[in-house]
Amino acid sequence: MQQDYLSQQRFSALPLHPIVRGALAKKGFDFCTPIQALSLPISLNGRDVAGQAQTGTGKTMAFLTATFHHLLTHQDPNLEYPHPRALILAPTRELAVQISNDAEFLAKASGLKTALAYGGDGYDKQLQVIECGVDILIGTTGRVIDYVKQGVIGLDEIQVVVLDEADRMFDLGFIRDIRYLLRKCPAPQARLTMLFSATLSYKVRELAFEDMNDPEYIEIEPEQKTGHRIKEELFYPSNQDKMALLLTLMEDEWPERCIVFANTKHRCEEIWGYLAADGHRVGLLTGDVAQKKRLSLLKQFTDGDLDILVATDVAARGLHISDVTHVFNYDLPDDREDYVHRIGRTGRAGESGVSISFACEEYAMNLPAIEEYIGHSIPVSQYETEALLELPKPYRLKRAVPPQGHTRHRSYHTK
């Protein structure tokens, strides 16, 4: 993390529980990010907070630090807690898993138990873990409601509630589910409630604040919606040149870790086929990919076993993957806010990043709304058709995926 990105607030100077302070220090957390520096003095004092900050600014560690501190300072050693004391809700299962992973070092240090509850996979396995006892339940609304209605867990002992990517949960229509779960928890005055998101509309704040106790709203205003450390670039390819331009730019840029976004599952599969045939270590992440495969792909990408991830917007929000160097918008998104969410995968936590977008014949009409929303024109670059790489015969999904150890190379084509 870049030092100039951090604030002057040290974690060691905050009134943290000694176990939390020690775990953070051991993990290398010294200075707070701006959102942490603003939110923690509020939440550590037991007051509700709604935090808005640009993607990748440390929101997750802000609410995890406050959650573990609150539970450790509000527990009776003479009591056993058969049900969860904290509930962390996320819009997607991938984000829930990432929050759980981020919480591991705090759980290990504190002895507090975390458990996951998300749909699509592992129902019985998740149930077994929860039945063994859980202090902090992290999950998606649907699966948590299932367990509540079955009597597997109760929410009457909840001391902390977190809504992560809150606006996304409202956008996805989870408002009724959220309110159902919050009504099962103690009253807002009897718990600590935190909302964090990259964007929090007035409507979302109004709805959410009905279930919060006089929250304090804080915001880290970015220099621009897209992040000043992201270098943006725009091409106007013909539909015929589009795929060849992508492969050529991959060779020219040689990204260390890259996400390519497209608007449809079919287009993602097509892109994957050409990139795989061109010798790239590439994974495909769409809504149709089985849950175990999705988690495996994300781990491979995070661990560096895959260099490129081709994804629909199912992966555009909440994926906390560090060191993404490049984002390609193969298709300009129909929703202008998705442009910000997509390219927010790079340039995180003070690092620099590159965003390259294609305004093709099919989606160029989306560009004016995007540029109006981000408040600036995206710099345009030119290309020469005769300099584009020749397209290989693409792989199809029914064919075997190249071995993960397949080596990327620059000599596959002659430029």
From Swiss-Prot:
The residue numbers the entry assigns to motif Q motif are 9-37
State one molecular function term (GO). ATP binding
Q: Which PANTHER family does this chain map to?
A: ATP-DEPENDENT RNA HELICASE RHLB, ATP-DEPENDENT RNA HELICASE RHLE-RELATED
Localization (cell): Cytoplasm
> Sorted alphabetically, which CDD domains does this protein's record hold?
DEADc (cd00268), SF2_C_DEAD (cd18787)
Taxonomic source organism: Haemophilus influenzae (strain PittGG)
Coiled-coil stretches, from where to where?
A: none
Instruction: Output the GO biological process annotations, alphabetical, semicolon-separated.
Output: RNA catabolic process
Keywords associated with the record: ATP-binding, Cytoplasm, Helicase, Hydrolase, Nucleotide-binding, RNA-binding
> HAMAP family from the xrefs?
DEAD_helicase_RhlB
Per UniProt, ATP binds at 53-60
GN (gene name): rhlB
Q: Give start and end of each Helicase C-terminal domain.
A: 241-389
Query: What biological function has been recorded for the protein in this entry?
Result: DEAD-box RNA helicase involved in RNA degradation. Has RNA-dependent ATPase activity and unwinds double-stranded RNA.
Q: What class of enzyme is it?
A: hydrolase
Quaternary assembly: Component of the RNA degradosome, which is a multiprotein complex involved in RNA processing and mRNA degradation.
Q: Which reaction is catalysed here?
A: ATP + H2O = ADP + phosphate + H(+)
Q: What name has this protein been given in UniProt?
A: ATP-dependent RNA helicase RhlB
